[in-house]
Amino acid sequence: MLVKTFQSLIDFVRYNASVMRCVRDPQLLKSNSVHRGEACGEVYILYTGSSLKGKDLGWLAGKDIIATNLFCLSDQYNRLDIKHYSIIEPWNYRNLTFLSFFTDLIMLRRKTGSQPTLWLHASAHHYIGQKRLHYEHFSESLLRALNVRLIASQGDFADDSEVRDNLSEVSNVAVGAMFFNVFLAMYLGYSKIYLLGADYTKSPIRIGHLYDNWQQTISVGELTDIAGFDVHGLTSKRNQKMIDFAAAKNVSIINVVDRDVCSPLFDSVYYDELSEGC
């Protein structure tokens, strides 16, 4: 027991030391600049809200798509050519099992022939080269087939005096998947960004995911009680600043909603109208 505890302590220290080295290594981020402005036009960001459960996303064929977090658990995932996939919250890398599990799901379940660029937090760099991560599922060879990019973020763009959205440097926009993926889309050069499955941005608020069998409509007060802080107030502040930042760049962010909900902050379009018009 003592040996196991000591080894865990060593792993923890090594992990945090590696994270600090990665964050301070400008070369890890500098290479991201090859993606800056590489795209144009429309992009569709696929989040994991329960509103996407059961929907046929075949109409997205041929379109530019960014997916995030555990969208790979959707039964639609292997039908789509994903251009970019992001898992950027650093807590995902606190344990080798988490990173191995997520990357294996993303890579093994993807559409045959699809080669998305995989965006990870710089803290993942410590693990990618470790044999322990790749022992069971041959992730190492799969990762070599993908374009892996690392990002680092410090601060919160909503509170800081400026938005640091240059992903080839230390930014302040990776404060959650909801926000990072929009800033990623802008960094890539897209001018029209559609949000699908971003259920926390809608009213009424529905919690749950496309990959589970649970959905619940809750009030702002109930969400605050669950989280222990004013989630709605914080996310609304971030969303509004992000909307204003995008507008200054002539970028439109459009929330795709069902007919029984509305989008208080973002411009919106009904899902059925968008999908049937494609």
Role assignments for model-derived ranges:
Residues 1-278:
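Metal-ion/cofactor- or nucleotide/acyl-coenzyme-handling active-site neighborhoods
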